[in-house]
């Protein structure tokens, strides 16, 4: 119910189909349609294939962390944990994914996108090829780097599974460039990008926008205790324990969160202006340099990843 306060919402569902599921845990298109029609503030729909922090892994929300409101919203029976398996049951291959996306778009009338961590690139080649040949597919793609954060993932996943954002995004973007369809997709970056320099870095790689999670949580008091799944969050951010929730004062924390967003935007605008641009989307891979392997020299992202974002090429041509 806190979503009904005026903000626009991207409704995301993953393998558990929480909020849009049948009693057996399968996806319910009827419930999604009903949800969208009843809540006009839902502006986009996002299908989470995987997340960068734990790609391919299953997850659980323990029953002791679910209030009655959460249980009803998710569609979970009393006394049961909320389980999200490591795979989708509504589709099993690329063709079925595209059909699934188009069906949701048709019956909701909303933009539909996908969020995914990156591993093998074979499936991305297949996806790009079939998007081009069928003229169907997602309106936007969220590339979630391995830096993506969660307090509930296994350490082995967080530390070793998945590809970091810059490598992941550049690899996928170049595949779509190869098929000439990168301009048909809105690109969103995710994974520890909530700092001014990282925002510009992501824009230079070709992102149209970024997602922010961890940094926003830090602004309201998260101390990265990684106890989210234990219901013992000491700062009150990720717990249903009433006593611990007292550590989170909404009136105070909302101001701090607002300050964070304002300062982030301010810093990005100032850096952009200092570099001679009017908008951060004007940055290209040629503008960002990083230390090379020996640490004694610099290399531009353009040379490292061997591409320029198409939108930047068009801007340069128009200028």
Name each region found by the language model:
Residues 4-12, 135-137, 144, 293-309:
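Terminal amphipathic helices with adjacent charged low-complexity linkers/tails
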Residues 11-50, 163-164, 169, 173-174, ...:
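Phosphate/diphosphate-binding loops
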Residues 1-130, 137:
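Active-site-facing alpha/beta catalytic cores
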